[in-house]
Regions:
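Short, conserved micro-motifs enriched in small and acidic residues
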Residues: 12-19, 23, 54-62, 206
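Metal-dependent de-N-acetylase/amidase catalytic core
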Residues: 169-240
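Short, charged beta->alpha transition segments
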Residues: 23-38
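Short glycine/proline- and acidic residue-enriched helix-loop micro-motifs
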Residues: 3-15
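Glycine-rich anion/phosphate-binding loops
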Residues: 13-27, 120-128
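Conserved alpha-helical scaffold segments that buttress catalytic/binding sites
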Residues: 30, 39-182, 202, 217-218
Length: 240
C-alpha cells in the first residue's frame, strides 16, 4: 500500500521509479564499501517513514533497510545512518521485529541516529551520538556510514524547523570532521555515503538546493582536500 499523502496509484511507471530510488542507495553503499577512498552520493530520499507493511507520509519503501540488508548478505557488513532530516526516521526501528538479521546489517546501538532537539542543543546531541558511533566504528562493529542531511531541519522549512543556516552547515562540519578524525585514528578509510532526504520549500526551491550544495562543498573541503568558498543563500519562508 502507498500512503494517502503520496496520492499516487500503483502503476508500472511508479513501480519502476521506486526501483531506481531504492537501487540508487544500494549501489552507492556497495560502491563505497568496495572503494572506501571515494565518497559516494545517492540523490535519493523518501525512505525513512515507510513501514514493513505499507508506505507512510512521502515514503513508499524503506530503502535504508533494503539496501543495508543486501549489503549485509553480500559482504557481511554493518552500517549506521546519521539521519539529520527534520523528522524522526522510524522505518529502521519499525523493521527490527520484522526483518531477520537486521541487527547485523544496521547497528542496534547507533545505527539510526536522529536528533529531536533544536539549535545549540541539537549540536550537543549530535556530538554525543557521534561519540557512541566512534566506539562502534573503531571497535569494528560498524563498517560504513550513511549521512542523510535533510534540508527540512532548517528553521525556515515548511515541515520542520530546528536549526539556523549556520547551525545546519555546522552539522555538516561536525560529521565530516568526525569521519576524518576516525580515519586518522584508525589509519583506514571509512566508507561514506551521502543521501538527500527531506527539504520542503514550495516558495523557494533554491533555498533547499543551496543548503545541499553547502553540505557537499563542506564534504569536499574537509574530506577531499578542496578549498571551495561557498555561502548558502537561504531566504526566509513566505507563507503561500
Amino acid at each position: 500500500k502507498t500512503s494517502r499523502i503520496l496520492n499516487i496509484e500503483w502503476s508500472p511507471e511508479y513501480a519502476e521509479s521506486v526501483r531506481y530510488e531504492n537501487a540508487s542507495l544500494y549501489h552507492a553503499i556497495r560502491y563505497a564499501v568496495q572503494h572506501p577512498e571515494e565518497v559516494c552520493f545517492s540523490p535519493s530520499a523518501a525512505f525513512h517513514h515507510a513501514n514493513p507493511t505499507r508506505g507512510a507520509l512521502f515514503c513508499a519503501f524503506s530503502g535504508q533497510v533494503i539496501a543495508s540488508m543486501k549489503i549485509y548478505y553480500e559482504f557481511g557488513l554493518c552500517g549506521a545512518y546519521i539521519d539529520l532530516d527534520g523528522h524522526y526516521g522510524n522505518s529502521i526501528d519499525n523493521s527490527r521485529d520484522f526483518v531477520k538479521d537486521i541487527d547485523y546489517a544496521i547497528s542496534p546501538v547507533c545505527g539510526n541516529i536522529n536528533i529531536m532537539a533544536s539549535y545549540e542543543k541539537y549540536l550537543e546531541e549530535l556530538r554525543s551520538n557521534l561519540s557512541i558511533l566512534r566506539t562502534e566504528i573503531t571497535e569494528g562493529r560498524v563498517h560504513y556510514v550513511v549521512f542523510c542531511h535533510g534540508a527540512d531541519s532548517h528553521e525556515w522549512d515548511e515541515l520542520a524547523s530546528q536549526l539556523t543556516t549556520e547551525e545546519w552547515v555546522e552539522c555538516s562540519r561536525i560529521v565530516y570532521s568526525f569521519i576524518k578524525e576516525i580515519e586518522s585514528q584508525t589509519h583506514r578509510q571509512i566508507p561514506l555515503i551521502l543521501a538527500l532526504f527531506g527539504g520542503y520549500r514550495r516558495d523557494d526551491y533554491n533555498s533547499v538546493l543551496s543548503l545541499h550544495t553547502a553540505d557537499l562543498v563542506t564534504c569536499l573541503n574537509i574530506l577531499c582536500g578542496h578549498n571551495i568558498d561557498y555561502l548558502p543563500e537561504v531566504t526566509p519562508r513566505k507563507v503561500l
